[in-house]
């Protein structure tokens, strides 16, 4: 099994327990979690909530995931932290600049997975997404360059 901890300015122990989780302080969540995944709205109190000090406090084997809002994490601080080995890895599908430029500090890092954000689920989005997947797989099968791949 897995122990799930949560933090929110509005979370109570009772609400967390009803979902099978334990509510902890933000600092405890950052320092003890194996996987830290952000699910917050972006606002004045959450912008750059994850910065250099939070990344430095994470476990060496932690994985940071942000599929919520780009501004929740300081991307430059995250890139520096990943190069320093804490957290161990990151996975993101939201970025301060989209499409992500090849000069972005996270592009090319071996311990980062960057994917496009599919924030709006509808048939046209999935048709485009699956068409892109088929195009990439076809190129790979025939030894051709992959379309839309970012590399440093």
Regions found by a protein language model. Name each.
Residues 2-3:
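Residues at the starts of beta-strands that form the adenosine-phosphate
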Residues 6:
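Conserved SAM-binding motif I beta-strand of class I
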Residues 9-105:
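Rossmann-like adenosine-cofactor binding region
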Residues 96-152:
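C-terminal helix-to-coil terminal segments
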């Amino acid at each position: 099994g897995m122990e799930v901890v949560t933090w929110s300015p509005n979370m109570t122990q009772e609400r967390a327990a009803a979902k099978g989780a334990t509510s902890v302080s933000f600092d405890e969540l950052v320092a003890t979690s194996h996987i830290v995944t952000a699910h917050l709205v972006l606002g004045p109190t959450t912008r750059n909530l994850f910065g250099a000090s939070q990344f430095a406090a994470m476990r060496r084997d932690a994985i940071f995931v942000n599929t919520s809002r780009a501004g929740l994490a300081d991307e430059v601080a995250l890139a520096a932290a990943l190069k320093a080995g804490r957290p161990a890895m990151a996975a993101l599908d939201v970025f301060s600049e989209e499409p992500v430029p090849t000069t972005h500090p996270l592009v090319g890092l071996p311990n980062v997975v960057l994917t496009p954000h599919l924030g709006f689920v509808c048939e046209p989005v999935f048709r485009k997404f699956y068409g892109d997947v088929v195009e990439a797989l076809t190129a790979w099968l025939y030894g051709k360059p992959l379309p839309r791949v970012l590399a440093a």
